[in-house]
Amino acid sequence: MADQLIRATAADGGIRAVGVITTRLTEEARQRHKLSYVATAALGRTMAAGLLMASSMKRAGSRVNVRVKGDGPLAGILVDAGLDGTVRGYVGNPHIELPPNARGKLDVGGAVGNGYLYVVRDIGYGYPYSSTVELVSGEIGDDVAHYLVTSEQTPSALMLGVFVGAGGVTAAGGLLVQVLPKAARDEALVAKLESRVGALSGFTPLLQAGKTLPEIFHDLLGDMGLTIFPESQILRFHCGCSFDRVLGALKMLGEAELQDMIVKDDGAEATCDFCGRVYQASSEHLTQLIVDLQTESSVSG
């Protein structure tokens, strides 16, 4: 099944639902960063959460940054997701592995530890909106749901899941169901929805059982006036890094540092944290940067 995002509404627009399948892009992240099992689960959940949050943004080019900063051995997570369906991300310690937790599951909470969740929404106007909440469990789903309730005042049910087998990621994705203000006062509706979400065994078991996103929506909201939007959105792992950006970053180091790199290393190597791509800048590239800096200095002087 292709990685995709599907939107739906129910209760005359009082309930908003978004589902994502992110199996392939999570596997790509695992391969790019050579992630351990628990690191794959942690990053995969956070990427799915980022895509779900970005889906509610309106302006083209809007993006959301999700940073999980905990005191656990994973050493943090950073994800950048866009309304356009692209996502990228990395963890601080990609090779960490822990024993299963008390439920026999990958111990994402133990890997993340205690700390904070930072969310920055950039809608393209130059004034990003940022918010911080304390981590509830470190399991990502609980933490993002807590953010949505406390920072956006929107009652939300969030399910995230990643299943990693011996051959890689076989199922990944998430589901976000939000009760909007027009329906939040209907206590019976909210209770009914909470009961149904709570009865689910998890998101990845549904995918492994062959359930599609529309079928999951029907199981949850089929008798609540469900409307599924016919257009699905393709999701993919994508990083906007480039050699030109690397040269721009190297140029900011200044003439003396660049000259030192030429003498000691005969060039420079840079690795993109988000996608793991390695860039090589030769001594000729660095020499040209020095020439550019000298030219700019003489012009400005």
UniProtKB/Swiss-Prot annotation:
Q: What does this protein do?
A: Redox regulated molecular chaperone. Protects both thermally unfolding and oxidatively damaged proteins from irreversible aggregation. Plays an important role in the bacterial defense system toward oxidative stress.
Q: What is its main location?
A: cytoplasm
List the Pfam families hit by this protein, alphabetically: HSP33
Gene Ontology MF term list: protein folding chaperone; unfolded protein binding
Coiled-coil ranges (or none): none
Q: Which PANTHER family does the entry link to?
A: 33 KDA CHAPERONIN (PTHR30111:SF1)
Species this chain originates from: Trichormus variabilis (strain ATCC 29413 / PCC 7937)
Q: Where in the cell is it found?
A: Cytoplasm
Q: Disulfide pairs?
A: 239-241, 272-275
| HAMAP family assigned to the protein according to its UniProt record, in alphabetical order | HslO (MF_00117)
Q: What's an example GO BP annotation here?
A: protein refolding
Does the keyword Chaperone feature in the UniProt annotation? yes
**Key words, A-Z:** Chaperone, Cytoplasm, Disulfide bond, Redox-active center, Zinc
Q: What's the encoding gene here? A: hslO
Query: Would I find Cytoplasm among this entry's keywords?
Result: yes
The UniProt PTM text for this protein says: Under oxidizing conditions two disulfide bonds are formed involving the reactive cysteines. Under reducing conditions zinc is bound to the reactive cysteines and the protein is inactive.
A cellular component term from Gene Ontology for this protein is: cytoplasm
Q: What is this protein called?
A: 33 kDa chaperonin
The UniProt similarity line reads:
Belongs to the HSP33 family.
